[in-house]
């Protein structure tokens, strides 16, 4: 039994790291195009891919919506300032995975290189406790099915914000 637990732990860590390494980039989301060959993605792409890979290996996975604040990340004020009509509080996609009969929060959003910019990066994950989350600030978690979006984000601002954020994160 202990050998099987170790094998599962190694597998979940390996899959987490595989998806975590994919560079973060805000871009169009099409669930049908998510596969192991994506070369970049945001929380939607990366959580969807990790969910698919984990379920393929027999893990129980739940989709989670997390409300976070972009202000809690190390993003230049000039980029945050683009959001004039839109709030900085946005919904985020993440996962819960059942590991050893316990639901564990697993967030693979930020690729390791973003640690240099002050983003919360999970390193050497133990495969059994919560990973670091999207920010170290205040977060609210919802089961995907229970989440009702009440946040009004203006599309033009969001697109400009995403464009500038992508430039900053890839620099």
Model-found features: residue ranges?
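Generic alpha-helical secondary structure signal
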Residues: 28, 123, 129, 145-146, ...
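Secondary-structure boundary elements
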Residues: 1-42, 46-51, 105, 168-169
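Solvent-exposed, well-ordered amphipathic alpha-helical segments
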Residues: 1, 7-14, 58-59, 99-100, ...
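Hydrophobic/aromatic-rich core segments of domains that either
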Residues: 11, 48-135
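Alpha-helical and coiled-coil interaction segments, frequently adjacent to or embedded
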Residues: 134-171
């Amino acid at each position: 039994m202990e050998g099987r637990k170790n094998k599962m732990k190694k597998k979940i860590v390996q899959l987490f790291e595989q998806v975590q390494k994919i560079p973060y980039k805000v871009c169009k989301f099409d669930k049908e195009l998510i596969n192991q060959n994506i070369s970049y993605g945001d929380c939607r792409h990366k959580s969807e891919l990790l969910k698919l890979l984990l379920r393929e290996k027999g893990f129980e996975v739940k989709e989670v919506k997390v409300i976070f604040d972009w202000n809690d990340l190390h993003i230049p004020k000039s980029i945050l300032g683009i959001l004039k009509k839109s709030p900085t509080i946005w919904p985020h996609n993440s996962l819960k995975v059942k590991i050893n009969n316990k639901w564990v929060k697993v967030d693979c959003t930020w690729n390791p290189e973003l640690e240099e910019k002050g983003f919360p990066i999970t390193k050497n994950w133990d495969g059994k406790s919560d990973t670091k989350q999207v920010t170290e600030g205040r977060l609210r978690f919802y089961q995907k099915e229970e989440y009702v979006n009440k946040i009004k984000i203006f599309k033009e601002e969001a697109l400009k914000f995403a464009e500038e954020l992508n430039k900053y994160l890839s620099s």
